[in-house]
Amino acid sequence: IETAAGKVTAPAYIYMGVRPDTVAIALGLGHTAYGRFAQNIGVNAYDLVPAGWDAAGGLALGGLKGKVTITADKSPLVTTEGSARQHGRGIGQALPIGVLLGTEQENDEHHHEIPGLPSQDFKTGLKSPVAADAQGEFANPESKDQGMYDPNHVQKMEKRRWAMTIDLARCTGCSACVTACYSENNIPTVGAPYQGRALSPSQWDERPGANIIKGREMAWIRLERYYEGNDNTENEFSPDFDTRFVPMMCQHCGNAPCEPVCPVYATYHSPDGLNVQVYNRCVGTRYCSNNCPYKVRYFNWFGYGEPERRQYAWPEPMHWSLNPDVTVRGKGVMEKCTFCVQRIRESEHRARAEGREVNADEFTTACAQACPSRAIVFGDAADENWTVSKLAYDRRAYHVFEELNTYTAVVYLKKVNYPAPASPAKA
């Protein structure tokens, strides 16, 4: 794209929200002098704007003539979203504002009734988490052999159910939660180690996006985007469609499908409702990932500290930014969202040292803390004083794949759709 002020070279991504005779490029993005770790990442559309001012004193952005040229450069554009269509699975659900106002009936096309399992049973799953038999001797409070743990403490923990609500009406898809999770939990980036440099044939597998194409992505939160309201599947332009963003992380199921298939008990259920992963037990069978209906467990394909593959290591001084409360995982093990268990335990230890209970909403996860629209709320769903316990029973609440009887700890709130304003021709 070239104007009299300058030119930029950017990849083309076909999106049905942009007219076919239009090119949209964001202002203010791209890094050209941000250090060696972000060198030549993206472009800034301000490079196309001359230093002129309009009558109001602002930068003149209108009236510029530009030229768009197709180059011969090719590079894969990779996303981790998967399908842009829900195919009737009801992952990202919505309802019209009229339903909340009581002026129309809800057409719940994604509601699934299971014989013998009322749809409201998930509330019981939140209030009374399924205690795993990994803590076998604690399952019976009358047991005389309580091991090394205080039985009163264990029973108190079983009354908790750490849970999360995600309001799809507030989520804008900004990915702040994803970035915060990377920073908080020492998650390595599987990206483009040779960005901006020519590749030899031996380095072809290291080209931008190559490892993501192979399914080797690493992110504890996956931001899914779905299109509704238009039947075209070729991403052709359409003025009438609905976009829904769904942050997808480990659902910390009460009946977790990943737990019974692990041959070494690397994943188990904690008394307070967490789906726990023990890294030094894991041998990398990936059975848990195969059995997870939400596909939120990830395998470490690379050794991020191996001296012979330094392109994947944490380069200096970036290793000083690692969170000391979270261990760095090695190649060959599975990992996933932990509900920021380090923050949970730190809060519990502080409360115990001060001789009190954990106060409602006194801490939260990294993703909830970073969310600018407060779409994510975390807390104890079994304690009515926590905000999450109130939101979990909102009339918009639903669970993804509720019919699987997994009793997930993540509750989504349906997006609220407003009627489209009448066009001048129809007004």
Please provide the spans of the model-predicted regions.
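Long, contiguous, secondary-structure-rich segments that constitute the structural scaffold
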Residues: I1-A163, A169, A180-S183, A192
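C-terminal, active-site-flanking charged/polar segments
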Residues: I1-G57, G284-V296, C367-V377, A381, ...
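Flexible loop/turn segments at secondary-structure boundaries
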Residues: K7-T9, V18-D21, H31-A33, T172-G173, ...
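Ferredoxin-like iron-sulfur electron-transfer modules
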Residues: G147-G173, T233-P257, P263-Y287, V296-A366
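Carboxylate/His-rich catalytic cores and anion/metal-binding grooves
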Residues: C174-E236, V283-W301
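Short microdomains enriched in Cys/His and/or Lys/Arg
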Residues: L199-R225, R281-N291, Y312-D325, V358-A375, ...
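Long, compositionally biased charged/polar accessory segments in the mid-to-C-terminal portions
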Residues: G332-A427
